[in-house]
Structures are given as structure tokens and as C-alpha cells.
Curated annotation (Swiss-Prot):
GO terms for biological process: guanosine tetraphosphate metabolic process. Signal peptide: none annotated. It comes from Mycobacterium bovis (strain ATCC BAA-935 / AF2122/97). Pfam families: RelA_SpoT. Coiled coil: none annotated. It comes from the Bacteria. This is Uncharacterized protein Mb1401.
Length: 273
């Protein structure tokens, strides 16, 4: 039996939380409205602790076995209160008990697109998730964000597993820097006047444009490298993959420089808050 310590209780992935979905829903309503939750609801701290341990347990399960891909960087977290509250207020119809990513696990690895897809399927199969649990955000990225997500709906709760290549991870980390500096609304296509105070709209739009262009460029490179892996003849395939590996290092370095320069120029112009 796989277990995780939650406070003083022992819980496995097949155990349900000690509160009902309806109680968590009411807690979410209270959080969104900025009022004290009903007395029969769990506390926010209890719910977050449960999800933090749930995410950590899934992380341990992933790190504890072998996959088709190697050298995975696996991390986990429970969603912060500020981020969760912003999500509830941005989408008033959303209920706390149905939010998929309160417990989150992230996997970053040096993967080709095909390897990324295969790893997602392996993880979904391992945790008993069906095919619709795999959400591919590569062909239709969200605000430039590209990854493959696996949504787990375990008795113990929901977990979102994000699987990213090193290029997808590089891009996402820079976009997080922008969100921290200019307001997280840029992740949801909000108009500049809705963002953090001190934002220069024209500078922000230029930065977002640079990020969008970089995302498209990285997608093109990854598609080319995947094509190399699909070459029929082994000798040609090995040669093409060798060149792709060299090219990947160059693309990583030039993309990092390009995005760092864009952010630094924006900060120098006074657009960083």
C-alpha cells in the first residue's frame, strides 16, 4: 500500500479526504467572497496540506520507477492561496472541489515530442487514467505555453502532471518572470489596463509578442527534431539526431539570450514595475 503522512493521519492514493466535495465547494465560495467559511467546512490549511502531500506522493511514485525516458526532473507543489483565489475570482463559475491543479506535479526532461507523448501515456496508464486524461497543449498552446498534461482523478483527489521538454520549460520559466513583473493576467490574455500598476502597455505588448514568436520558433525546432527521429534508415537517423542534439544546445542558448535581453530592455525602459 502506498501511503503519505498528512498531519497525524495516514492516507494512501485510494483513500478519500476526510471531508465531502460539498464541504470543499462551500469553502471555495467563502474564499472567493472573502468571508469566513461555514463551521462544517475544512480549513483552507487542511485542504492545502492534503493536496501538498498528495502531490508529493505522486512525485515519489514517479521518481520511484523506471520510464521510457530517463533523467527526469520531478517537482511538486500545492497551489498557493493567492493564485487559487485569483483563479476562483477570474472564473466565478468554478468550484474549488473541481479545480484540477490544486495538487500539481511537474516533469522537465530532455525529450523529443514523441518521447514526451509516450511518457504521458505511460504515466496515465500507471495511475489508471484513461486516454482523455491526457491534454496535449502543443498544437494549440495556451498563450504560447506548450506542454502535455496528465489529469489524474484519484480517490484521494485530483492531480495535474505537467510534462515539458527542456525548450518548453525554458519558455514557461521566462513567461512566469513576466507574469511576476507585469501581473499574472498576461497568462489569460487580459488587456494591459487590467494588469498590475506601473505597466507600460506598449512595452508589455511588445514583450508578449517576443514570447509568442519564441514559442512558435521553439515549436518549429522541436517538430524538426522529431522528424529526425522518424527517419527510416538507422544510419541516417543517428546522424540526423546527432546534428539535432548540437542544434538543440544552440537553440537553448540563443533563446535564453533573446528572452533575457527583451526582459532587460523592458525593465530599463521602466516597464518592469
Amino acid at each position: 500500500m502506498v501511503v503519505a503522512l498528512v498531519g497525524s493521519a495516514i492516507v494512501d492514493l485510494h483513500s478519500r479526504p476526510p471531508w465531502s466535495n460539498n464541504a470543499v465547494r462551500r469553502l471555495g465560495v467563502a474564499l472567493r467572497d472573502g468571508v469566513d467559511p461555514p463551521v462544517d467546512c475544512p480549513s483552507y490549511a487542511e485542504v492545502m496540506l492534503w493536496h501538498a502531500d498528495l502531490a508529493a506522493e505522486v512525485q515519489d511514485r514517479i521518481e520511484g520507477r523506471s520510464w521510457s525516458a530517463s533523467e527526469l526532473l520531478v517537482t511538486s507543489r500545492a497551489k498557493s492561496q493567492d493564485t487559487l483565489l485569483a483563479k476562483l475570482r477570474r472564473r466565478p463559475y468554478l468550484q474549488l472541489n473541481t479545480i484540477q491543479d490544486i495538487a500539481g506535479v511537474r516533469i522537465d526532461a530532455d525529450l523529443l515530442l514523441g518521447e514526451q507523448t509516450r511518457l504521458a501515456r505511460e504515466i496515465a496508464d500507471h495511475f489508471g487514467a484513461d486516454q482523455p486524461a491526457i491534454h496535449d497543449l502543443r498544437d494549440h498552446p495556451h498563450a504560447g505555453y506548450r506542454a502535455v498534461h496528465v489529469w489524474l482523478r484519484l480517490p484521494a483527489g485530483r492531480v495535474e502532471i505537467q510534462i515539458r521538454t527542456i525548450l518548453q520549460s525554458l519558455w514557461a520559466n521566462f513567461y512566469e518572470l513576466l507574469a511576476d513583473a507585469y501581473g499574472r493576467g498576461i497568462r489569460y490574455d487580459e488587456r494591459p489596463e487590467q494588469l498590475a500598476a506601473g505597466v507600460v502597455p506598449a512595452q508589455l505588448q511588445e514583450l508578449v509578442g517576443v514570447m509568442q514568436d519564441a514559442s512558435a520558433d521553439l515549436a518549429m525546432h522541436e517538430a524538426e527534431w522529431q522528424h529526425c527521429a522518424e527517419i527510416e534508415y538507422p544510419g541516417q537517423r543517428a546522424m540526423a539526431l546527432g546534428e539535432a542534439s548540437k542544434n538543440k544546445a544552440t537553440v537553448l542558448a540563443t533563446t535564453k539570450f533573446r528572452l533575457e535581453r527583451a526582459i532587460n530592455e523592458a525593465e530599463s525602459a521602466g516597464g518592469g514595475g
